[in-house]
Amino acid sequence: MKAKYIVIAMLFLAVGSMAFAVDVDGVLKDGEYSKEAVFDKGNYRLYWEFQDDKVFMAIVAKTPGWVAIGFEPSTVMANSDMIFGLVGEPGNVQAVDAWSSGMFGPHPPDVNQGGASSILSFAGTRTGDMVVFEFSRLLNTGDKFDKVIPVSGNFKVIWAYGPNLQFTAKHSKAGSAVLKMEGGN
């Protein structure tokens, strides 16, 4: 009888811990992400969570176009590892793993430069001009066009969103920040 209660308790703990796991489905749920940074007066929000050797991120932005996040640029956009989310009609979601070679671009996809797309999963939803884009990737992909994402300390990011769903369209709004990877900016 005692063993039965132990099994039930273990199942309860397992199910309870799964409820807090990130589900890359393009929908944010309460408690899904424990870290958040807010930019552009709330028009761009970045959420992130670490699980094992992976990072899960969500971008929520008010835009008719694409959304993007860049990691550890050297100057402006130069040498930045970037992820673009293009969220169109239901079922039409694209993710681009890119690398910016210059201060103001260009930022072609990693696969066009001899690298790999390191995005493990992605999803997005759009309601009017509100976009939710989620993705996951390894903290250290080993790709020469990807930056290692730390789980603690400061980490410089650049963020942007575009006027339409053309990956090459110039951003409507952009900025940079230093994140405290334990949570916040």
Predicted ranges, named:
Residues 1-2:
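N-terminal secretory signal peptides that target proteins for export/translocation
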